[in-house]
């Protein structure tokens, strides 16, 4: 199999990644020390931009310390979990680092989640408090109703006029000139600082635990991956309840002493306007977002922007062509990572790039520090030769600490010290890795991991449904769309629209299927599991399905 390969020379004056991070004093892999060393070295440098607000590194340090003081006043201490429910906002940055300084743990959730989804995460994490955006407060409060002990609530910013907030107030509101006294730092590099819930084959999200050193090292790895420069302006449009925005964009900017441009959400119609106005130079994206931008009216494009590089999942040749030739963005870097193993592989910025490849094992700016090791194995755990498809196994110091309160699932994720990704891949003779398919029952839609088991369970609860099976089908935006195969109860009736309406009532909008097909039977294993691997090969399912996206 042949693949397009090319190399782009580094721009004159490019600073080597190790030199970029060596400009600052040691941080000891502590999140707060990472911020503090940058703020002490370059206090007036612009660190964070959010719409019409600009924060210097000194500003971010002060806001973080003030947030830490407010958290201390609420009794937040080592090991406590605090939920954060908001679209992207500067307060999430301050809260994340402040919680880490307290030795506490941020539990971010999607601001679009419904009550049931939020309830599961916050109850499983046993959060002691919730910092919510004003528009998310009601859902957060309903989700936490009945929790013992009852968590406290705080707004991440003052509520707009007319939006009810009851007795809940903003977490912190220290006027200028007030002395900040947040207490002695309690958290260190080995302490868990973030709990990210990711969909799993069980149908219930698993809480992925990461320590501070993981987050900092992932940021250092991102500086190497994208050759982030001191004057970089990193545009963050991906949500801060996922790995990419926190571990790559935010921490990568901090590591390099660069500038993070934070947008509330990805907006395709405003993307080029924002990129042009902010003079952003780098952006991370997902395949669906790139596909949407390619299909937008060209009058939205703003020539003269400063964006030069984009990191994301494997891009096809048309994406490369459009972004390089029409959008004037020469560097598209592909890579692979998971919530459990952030930034595991990538196409080399400073070497040969092979289109649609996952790339090679990631490197650290310091060549003496080894990051990723990778191997491909068969079902028995034996390594296979180059060109042979098997399961992708990864070893890396940037590895989850485990699944929260789930020793069984944690143990099942490893074999002989190697993390089992559940993804099928193969390696070529030159050490580049190529994704084939997912072994797990996970659907990848617009950057979200969606549990097929969760969809099966929720749709199976419809009074007319005997059984349901969710399957991934190719999306014209890249990644997957959702197809639901439905077996109705005898004598019951339901339409495709009925199934979609049920999903809209019980699930987040992104989990609503595009396709619904009614079947006479579902294939099963001897242990009564639906044989989805057989169904994925049945092209007639999609051909017969009702397309609700039309």
Tell me what each language-model feature is.
Residues 3, 73-74, 101-172, 298, ...:
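Structural core segment of the AMP-binding/adenylate-forming
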Residues 23-28, 32, 36, 44-89, ...:
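Conserved AMP-binding/adenylate-forming core of the ANL superfamily
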Residues 43, 154, 176-197, 204, ...:
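Conserved pre-ATP/AMP-binding loop-to-beta segment of ANL
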Residues 56-58, 193-217:
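Conserved AMP-binding A3 loop
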Residues 113-114, 130-132, 337, 391-396, ...:
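AMP-binding/adenylate-forming catalytic core of the ANL superfamily
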Residues 216-233, 241-281, 296:
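Conserved AMP-binding/adenylation subdomain of ANL enzymes
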Residues 277-285, 294-355, 373:
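Gly/Ser/Thr-rich phosphate-binding loop
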Residues 349, 353, 365-371, 380-412, ...:
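Conserved ATP/PPi-binding loop(s) of AMP-dependent carboxylate-activating enzymes
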